[in-house]
Amino acid sequence: MTAKTAPKVTLWEFFQQLGKTFMLPVALLSFCGIMLGIGSSLSSHDVITLIPVLGNPVLQAIFTWMSKIGSFAFSFLPVMFCIAIPLGLARENKGVAAFAGFIGYAVMNLAVNFWLTNKGILPTTDAAVLKANNIQSILGIQSIDTGILGAVIAGIIVWMLHERFHNIRLPDALAFFGGTRFVPIISSLVMGLVGLVIPLVWPIFAMGISGLGHMINSAGDFGPMLFGTGERLLLPFGLHHILVALIRFTDAGGTQEVCGQTVSGALTIFQAQLSCPTTHGFSESATRFLSQGKMPAFLGGLPGAALAMYHCARPENRHKIKGLLISGLIACVVGGTTEPLEFLFLFVAPVLYVIHALLTGLGFTVMSVLGVTIGNTDGNIIDFVVFGILHGLSTKWYMVPVVAAIWFVVYYVIFRFAITRFNLKTPGRDSEVASSIEKAVAGAPGKSGYNVPAILEALGGADNIVSLDNCITRLRLSVKDMSLVNVQALKDNRAIGVVQLNQHNLQVVIGPQVQSVKDEMAGLMHTVQA
């Protein structure tokens, strides 16, 4: 019996990869959140009273349908994570890894149910007993609610089993069960044992998470600032997803009862309140970690920084960088994707980025102090309209333009002063940058709109790339020889920035079209290596 050992990765690389896997369920969460937000707001009594035509039965049926569809992602959140993690981490046979992830998570909960039944805790309908043991219905199974953290742990274990056994060779008599077929088999066995351990160790995990949540809550209005600043500071390293998931989906982001059910995590609480017909208004303790905190920086601050960079560019270069700044501005304000603007100053002035992180965190605190209650994930204009304006004055959405305008002025003044006082080389400040922009625009774009062959060559060619993946805005790569990577050539071909993590791992910041660039590059690599 033999098996192929998976390549070893450092802890840093592992957390990089783990954070990347969160993007698949988070992307669906964002879409479902908008569906739920529109459906619930337009079917609310207050909106119908204000706009009677919306009370039409056909329209109300559509809005109710939107709410139902939108609530899907939040009802099956742990399941999505336990599937997405093996899918994203697996190097080969990703479909098998995802399938095994679901099997492992379901079997783990069945084993927990077995333990609870064997101990005489189940079956019961006593609400006090269920609450005392944190028992919920998961996939129709009464089990201990381990939330997102339990799903993440299950996903990681299944991924490790997949990497260890997906190429296993069994004796001829058992050969049918070898290879990829063995992965869900071993996953069900191992996760069945893990499920027996969960009731013994989970109270310790729960206490730790609750303690973290208590610490954040005890910080009062300073807590959101710690979160907002921390997220920005971790973003260049791709580790912010871990912090965000912890606050959004675990007890660290708070725990409340909504419609008779105990719900944990800031985003989960907000979405539960959205879909609960008896809820009037949203929890300030939950929304203070969500979209509203980003809005001062995203809708005001970064546009102010972009205008400052435009005004500080040489007059003859302004028309050359206008497209770069406008595309970054649209990505930020409309899509909530800030890297295209942030990476324009991150590398030339790291101190400015730290100031930006602090001001972003301060925005979280200011929104919290003002009692704004706008939830969801992105902090963009869509969230502002759907979860702010459409839900009425009770969200205090009218405070957002006021604070955003102040942040616009503050950012503009700080950036203009810093750029001119310290002669920072932001886009358009010197002739070399201008020629690089011209060169990039003059390149031969492919289907992605980028000169992917030139980007691949700047990375040292297909033979130099060990692994290729992407997140929302960045290519994530492992290379054999970092000395073969030409950073300037990457920037000449419209890369916004390059983050070298260590001797073999780097990230190339592309922007919103990174998925198209990655797919085109993967196809090109396959052709070259075939």
From Swiss-Prot:
Induction of its expression: By maltose. Repressed by MalI.
Gene Ontology molecular function terms on file: D-glucose transmembrane transporter activity; kinase activity; maltose transmembrane transporter activity; protein-N(PI)-phosphohistidine-sugar phosphotransferase activity; protein-phosphocysteine-glucose phosphotransferase system transporter activity
Compartment list: Cell inner membrane
Major localization class: membrane
Pfam families for this protein: PTS_EIIB, PTS_EIIC
GO biological process, one term: carbohydrate utilization
Record-linked InterPro entries: Glu_permease_IIB, PTrfase_EIIB_Cys, PTS_EIIC, PTS_EIIC_1, PTS_Glucose_EIICBA, PTS_IIB_1, PTS_Mal/Glc-sp_IIBC_component, PTS_maltose/Glc_sub_IIC
Active-site residues, record numbering mapped to chain: C471
GO cellular component: plasma membrane
Record's catalysed reaction(s): D-maltose(out) + N(pros)-phospho-L-histidyl-[protein] = alpha-maltose 6'-phosphate(in) + L-histidyl-[protein]
Membrane topology field: Multi-pass membrane protein
Cross-referenced SUPFAM superfamilies: Glucose permease domain IIB (SSF55604)
EC number, as in UniProt: 2.7.1.208
Catalytic EC class: transferase
Protein's UniProt name: PTS system maltose-specific EIICB component
Biological source species: Escherichia coli (strain K12)
